[in-house]
């Protein structure tokens, strides 16, 4: 690996990994479950990189030995040919491993491990936009199921002709944000609505916002900025229906964000859920501000995740989904059934390549 700065990074990672391994064996850490889990997670995050680095070191030593054998076998054609084949094989494996190591050393998004709030809003297109928003709720729910994630509908505003004016899903599981963060933006659909007698194709949109869940300590909310009212809500049945004010209407004055929660059975639970959604929305605003500062220096080829950015078109006539950031097409029927993994992996790969290009430019 010619890049000295990458070798230096790998040595630093190895030293940190060794120190974390030592700390796990420390009796003082072992008796503190919170600290032990924190150290264990930090160590686990570095393990793949360290193992790949050790494999790279081993392959390089094997390459040195193969070259020495090739040099010493000047008068033995068969042995010399074997050494040449081994040198070519090892060189190829080392080159592949170096590319993998470069990706492993890219800065990690601190939000990648987090659960998310996924907000889907009907956009342009009238009733059809609400129906389309409902289709997206179904698509993401199906994708989450393939990943083994848990999905809960935490807030909804139903559209008159079906679907949603707005829906917020809470999605919990392993590294949810790391994959779904690429879904933020405008999703456009081109199809013939069921109500269209003439068979004319309509274009409608829905906006997706992906918000990592945050703790109270990460986002401060001034109580003076909140207006909170309650209302009666139809529940799951029984005496509480329309008699007890369990619904919560929360308004955040500085941003104009309004959240109406009715999904929980108690007013307290709906209040907690409303504040949870508000924290996620405020954190997403902060993230977007940081993102805009970054993209002013580097325009990501994958896209900024801006809500106003059209990221994808779903064309029913041609059974085609076009991701405009990637310039690639995918099967519409597969995607709508929740097969988003090919698109998401392509976004991750493109993002990594863009970061690698920036890193190389900075080192040049």
Swiss-Prot record:
Pfam families: PCRF, RF-1. Peptide chain release factor 1 directs the termination of translation in response to the peptide chain termination codons UAG and UAA. It is found in: Cytoplasm. Its main location: cytoplasm. GO terms for molecular function: translation release factor activity, codon specific. The modification N5-methylglutamine is found at residue 239. Belongs to the prokaryotic/mitochondrial release factor family. It comes from Thermosynechococcus vestitus (strain NIES-2133 / IAM M-273 / BP-1). Methylated by PrmC. Methylation increases the termination efficiency of RF1. This is Peptide chain release factor 1. One of its GO terms (cellular component) is cytoplasm. InterPro entries: PCRF (IPR005139), Pep_chain_release_fac_I (IPR000352), Pep_chain_release_fac_I_sf (IPR045853), Prokaryotic/Mito_RF (IPR050057), RF-1 (IPR004373). HAMAP family: Rel_fac_1. Gene3D superfamilies: 3.30.160.20, 3.30.70.1660, 6.10.140.1950. Keywords: Cytoplasm, Methylation, Protein biosynthesis.
């Amino acid at each position: 690996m010619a890049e000295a700065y990458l070798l230096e990074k790998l040595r630093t990672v190895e030293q940190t990994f060794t120190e974390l391994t030592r700390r796990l064996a420390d009796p003082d850490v072992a008796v503190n479950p919170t600290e032990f889990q924190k150290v264990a997670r930090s160590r686990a995050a570095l393990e793949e990189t360290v193992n790949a680095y050790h494999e790279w070191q081993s392959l390089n030593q094997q390459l040195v030995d193969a070259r020495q054998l090739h040099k010493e076998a000047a008068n033995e054609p068969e042995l010399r040919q074997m050494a040449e084949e081994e040198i070519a094989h090892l060189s190829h494996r080392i080159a592949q491993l170096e590319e993998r190591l470069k990706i492993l050393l890219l800065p990690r998004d601190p939000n990648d491990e987090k659960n998310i709030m996924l907000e889907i809003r009907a956009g342009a297109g009238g009733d059809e936009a609400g129906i389309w928003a409902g289709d997206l709720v179904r698509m993401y729910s199906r994708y989450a199921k393939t990943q083994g994630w848990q999905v809960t509908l935490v807030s909804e505003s139903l559209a008159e002709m079906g679907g949603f004016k707005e829906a917020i899903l809470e999605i919990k599981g392993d590294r949810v944000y790391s994959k779904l963060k690429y879904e933020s933006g405008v999703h456009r659909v081109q199809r013939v609505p069921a109500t269209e007698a003439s068979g004319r194709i309509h274009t409608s949109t829905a906006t997706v916002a992906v918000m990592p869940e945050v703790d109270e300590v990460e986002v401060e909310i001034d109580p003076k900025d909140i207006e909170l009212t309650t209302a009666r809500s139809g529940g799951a049945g029984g005496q509480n229906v329309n008699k007890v004010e369990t619904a919560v209407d929360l308004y955040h004055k500085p941003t104009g964000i309004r959240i109406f929660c009715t999904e929980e059975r108690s007013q307290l639970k709906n209040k907690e859920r409303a504040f949870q959604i508000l924290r996620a929305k405020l954190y997403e605003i902060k993230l977007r501000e940081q993102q805009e500062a970054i993209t002013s220096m580097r325009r990501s080829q994958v896209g900024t995740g801006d809500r106003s950015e059209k990221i994808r078109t779903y064309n029913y006539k041609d059974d085609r989904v076009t991701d405009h950031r990637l310039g690639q097409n995918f099967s519409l029927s597969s995607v709508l059934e929740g097969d988003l993994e090919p698109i998401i992996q392509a976004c991750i790969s493109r993002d990594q390549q863009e970061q690698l290009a920036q890193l190389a430019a900075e080192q040049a």
